[in-house]
């Protein structure tokens, strides 16, 4: 695995957000970590979240199921809709664990009361309210001491709630909360990953991705940095410093 993937996998932060460019390997390592938490803790319960079921089925859940198959992990499927299981029961040593797959629509209605981990893929597509609801359900007794709230996403715009919660620069930090005279800590980790850091992309992938992109688009879609996301066709071409700024022509 790549160095950023190893960092994500070994982080003990309660809430970890990985923001990365296309093909940076963020979704697959989040699925691997979710599976490890599922099989290592008997009775654990987790949920994989995406903005809609079509996106969940076509991308995130497909990756999750491929990881299970590669690891030769057996499971029993439940809640079959549209050819996809939305609940898995995974036999583990000492019992079994569960994994749910949900879209954000009517999330409160379909979420269980308690989870040991959750994973939100493409978090830029969901509202902050989803994050708050999931925070309130990260309390499964079986997973005490090993809770994990995971978010992965392509870079959102600068005024997105992810920027508000996790900050502008990659960092680890904690938030202190006073409860009945005692201080409790919530730990956070924000990672930023570039497409260039994934050695497993096919030959030519990065070159194809870079073709035709402006520097601002490269910063966001390749380097994984926050940036402006245009909506609709531009009235004027996007500003590029190297193209539109220069020395004046002297007479």
Q: Where are the language model's segments positioned?
A:
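Pre-Walker A adenine-sensing motif
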Residues: 1-13
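Short hydrophobic/aromatic beta-strand immediately N-terminal to the Walker A/P-loop
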Residues: 16-19, 47
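Inter-Walker segment of RecA-like/P-loop motor cores
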Residues: 54-116, 226
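Walker B catalytic acidic pair
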Residues: 121-122
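ASCE P-loop NTPase helicase motor core
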Residues: 125-204, 208
């Amino acid at each position: 695995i790549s160095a950023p993937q190893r960092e994500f996998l070994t982080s003990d932060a309660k809430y970890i957000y990985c923001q990365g460019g296309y093909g940076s390997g963020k979704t697959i390592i989040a699925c691997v970590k979710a599976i490890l938490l599922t099989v290592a803790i008997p009775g654990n319960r987790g949920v994989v979240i995406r903005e809609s079921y079509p996106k969940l089925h076509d991308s995130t859940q497909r990756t999750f199921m491929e990881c299970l198959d590669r690891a030769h992990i057996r499971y029993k499927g439940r809640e079959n809709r549209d050819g996809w299981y939305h609940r898995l029961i995974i036999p583990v040593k000492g019992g079994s664990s569960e994994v749910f797959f949900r879209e954000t629509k009517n999330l409160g209605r379909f979420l269980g009361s308690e989870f040991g981990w959750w994973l939100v893929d493409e978090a830029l597509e969901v509202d902050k309210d989803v994050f708050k609801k999931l925070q309130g359900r990260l309390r499964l007794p079986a997973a005490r001491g090993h809770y994990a709230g995971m978010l992965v996403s392509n870079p959102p715009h600068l005024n997105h709630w992810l920027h508000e919660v996790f900050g502008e620069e990659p960092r680890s930090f904690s938030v202190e909360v006073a409860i009945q005279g005692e201080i409790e800590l919530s730990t956070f980790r924000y990672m930023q990953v570039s497409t260039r850091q994934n050695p497993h992309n096919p030959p030519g992938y990065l070159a194809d991705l870079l073709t035709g992109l402006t520097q601002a688009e490269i910063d966001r879609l390749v380097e994984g940095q926050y940036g402006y996301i245009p909506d609709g066709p531009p009235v004027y071409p996007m500003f590029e410093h190297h193209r539109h700024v220069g020395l004046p022509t002297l007479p």
